[in-house]
Amino acid sequence: MAKNFIWGPDGRLPHIEDHTKRKLEVLKSYLDIYFDTVVRNPAQDRLNITLVDGFSGGGAYADGAETRSGSPLVLLSAVEQAAVRLNERREKPLKINARFIFVDDEFEHVAALRRELKSRDYAEDDPRITIYHGTFVDHLPAILQKITKTQIKGRSIFFLDQFGYSDVPMSAIRTIFNSLDRSEVVLNFAIDSLLNYLQDASAELELYRQFGVDARFISDWKQRKDEKMGRALTQRALMAHIHANSGAKFFTPFMLWSRTDNRWMMLAHLSQHQAARDKMLGVHWQKQNSFTHAGPGGLFNLGYDARLKESCDSFFSFSEIDRTKLSRELINALPSEIHRIMHGGQLEIGRLLAEIGNRTAGTNEDIFEVLSELAQARELEVLSSIGRPKRAGTKISIKDRLILPSQPTLFFSKKF
Ligand SMILES: C[S@@+](CC[C@H](N)C(=O)[O-])C[C@H]1O[C@@H](n2cnc3c(N)ncnc32)[C@H](O)[C@@H]1O
């Protein structure tokens, strides 16, 4: 086992690595945005949610002379802080009714986690916290049963921080999404470890086949000429397979560079709802994700795209320069996309977001701004949810609808 993740009986904490810090920061930022946006209705007085940490570890790390929270404590404190923050602005108090399920298959890690919780004044029999010793997959049926028994919509976040890529089968993720409507998964996946150790024989193994790795995939990977581009394209192909085989509608990769191992790790966010993906995308921009996918940020497709081999310089990252580029790309790409989905009638903005959500690095706000520009340029007309025309320049919302302008315009007449 990697020595940076060993919690022994002597109580010594493992030293935290930079990429682990970053991973936990991403998790924390995501949870903050999640809670800040999930309860929109001021009349709502309760939020039921279960947070599952399927690979919880021992709860804390050493960072020089300081102690740093591990993922179980990040989950607990994110909920405690959200409860305070959200109630500051509310007349009707909101209760976050959260349950926590922590799983680890190392007995010593479970013991360390219990010690850590106790030292932070969580009672051993705290009814909100369940700790399982054993593998995540073995405990998954009991976890799902626990959630569905009391939560109709199954609002839950699964943080699945495996070491490599073999402890969370795609079938487990499909089971989560099939069982719980409002579930989200944040999956750690050692994407470069998988690629670096691929052998011809891997194509025969179900472990690899579940990620779409077959003989053709392996031979394309081995024959790569340009290391950076070949790796980026193969990572992309793998992401597309993981997305397709996970049963999730939305997929957002967040790349973390491990200096110790000299390789990329992927933290993927998987969800069934566009709003959830939009929240994760907000974290990408905030944290300047080092996911440099090949190609434009405006509209793209994950998955292998041979044409990108010719455009080695077109890597996209989440910088301010890219944000400007992204707006320009969206201005050019959206009209034809809207026309394609619209089929001549009206198009709800919510549907547009759901259609293009996986294929853009733009957040909903970025897309609203571009739509607003297109409306001001009379390329589009915007109707409110009750069908009233909106003045160009007014704020656009997810419930609005788009129609083509009565007069043909530059974009639409040029393209169709
Ligand atoms: C990367 S560490 C987790 C770190 C922790 N999530 C954090 O951020 O503080 C992975 C943990 O998963 C545990 N583990 C390994 N295989 C497992 C499995 N199949 N099911 C559950 N836990 C497992 C290990 O014992 C280890 O504590």
For each feature predicted by the language model, list its residue ranges.
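Class I SAM-dependent methyltransferase Rossmann-like catalytic core
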Residues: 2-46, 64
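SAM cofactor-binding core of SAM-dependent methyltransferases
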Residues: 31-142, 362-369, 373
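Short amphipathic alpha-helix with an adjacent loop that forms part of the alpha/beta core around
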Residues: 139-151, 174
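A short, conserved alpha-helix within the catalytic core of class I
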Residues: 165-175
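A conserved mid-domain beta-alpha-beta active-site/ligand-binding segment of alpha/beta enzyme cores
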Residues: 201-259
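Conserved beta strand-loop-helix elements of the APE1-like EEP
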Residues: 266-276
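C-terminal target-recognition/interaction regions appended to catalytic cores
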Residues: 283-416
